[in-house]
Amino acid sequence: MVALSAAGAWAQEAKSPGCANLDPRACLVLALDAMGGRARLESLKSIAYTSAGHTALVEQSYRQEPFITAYERLMVKVDFAGNRVYRESRLTWPEADPGTSEVVTTFVFGPQGGVRKNASADGPCSLSDLDWARDTLSLGPARLLLTALQAPDLHYESPEVLRATSHAVLAFTTGRKQVRVLLNQFNHLPDAFETVEQFHDHWWQWGDVHRRVYLDNFQDFHGLVYPTNEVEERNGILWQSRQVLSLDQNVAIDETRFRMDPKVAEKSAQGKGWDRPFQADKSQELAPGVTLFEGAWNATLIDQGDGVLVLEAPISGTYIQGVFDEAKRRYSSLPIKAALLTSDSWPHVGGVRQAVARGVPVYILDLNQPLLDRLVKSPHKLHPDLLEQSPKAPRWQIVSEKLSVGTGKNRVELYPLRGASTERQYMVYFPDAKLLYASDTLALNDDGSLYDPELMREVAEAVKREGLLVNTVFAMHQGPMPWTNVMALVQKAGS
């Protein structure tokens, strides 16, 4: 009998480490007590904190891990009573030109939505801004356990080992989001929480992303035991880390800081985010049969007589399907021969899953295949796209050296750049038109100077190396420019 009793106790402990013989709600109460108690957390009507952090720029086209990093200082006020958030951000952007790396923004969120504060007027915020604010109010360290307490479906899931320690796992639903909280079996503090969701930031293209946020460096702030460090992991990548530098509780609320234009806030909430439609109204012919469609991310149709090439598949499946539809409208008798994806930046390849689902061959750089293989295989069950509904294998055409595509006046030649900053991009050359597509290397600042001149310097080296004659150049974020003008800007930047 003693042996059976011990076995039963062991089974209970194995199911919910640190919470043996407790139901999920009682286990949660232990966690609340560890953070200072339910009453202490519920007494928080507002907090203000400053933090320093960094984010790995996993979505950029420079190099894969170890990734280049952006750094950010935040000053945040959270009004729990009014469901409002005020955030001042000072971001250091590593890809900026010298002297222009710091970006300062102010974001305000309330029940009606959110805005970015500008000097003259409020501007729309992004859907990812709204997600961040809602997470701050419901899943931030001061509210995570209280949100779990309100969930009618709170339950145990299988325990997990974190940092060599078994953790009880409590799971619940908030809104449409499934949340799992990992409670330390010894001190009952929440060491991490997890979600699976489709984000509205640069991770949107990956569909169902597994997020784990590690909570660490707990400190006692007048009875509130608060984790001052958060490390966010997405799909196994340590993506972001934030360290709280100061924390004040029940601070006074300055109503003037939370004022916002309600019409702009409503517009923000109605934004499409990355799932935006293609607009064909802004187009220009760069050469007979070569049509550029300019937008935040450009796309180009190339008529080769026996079919149409689509140059770039950016943003989303919705966007690139619009490009395919425009190709069909303009060239109804011609098939889409292939899509040319010249880089691996996530916004630049956001439509690749749609191209694969449509059975379109896709020309990709050799270095980019591992990332694109993962992107094509990534689950999209929460918001199924065409590839999730009808899986297909990609028809990759690998670019590892000069490669000619098509014949006739609009044949193109693909050349890997192989520069230090451009090694994950290839350029597209139109020999007859002496026209060059320079991937994501050419963009102008507001004063007409080159953004990150090193990129175009590496393009110039590749053009010289391959012996190309170029009259006109265009790129992902730049319309056509005379080659001589761009070379003059490169020379000026280096002088």
Predicted segments with their positions:
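Gly/Pro-enriched, hydrophobic low-complexity segments
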Residues: 163-262, 429-431, 438-439, 444-466
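Zn-dependent metallo-beta-lactamase
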Residues: 241-305
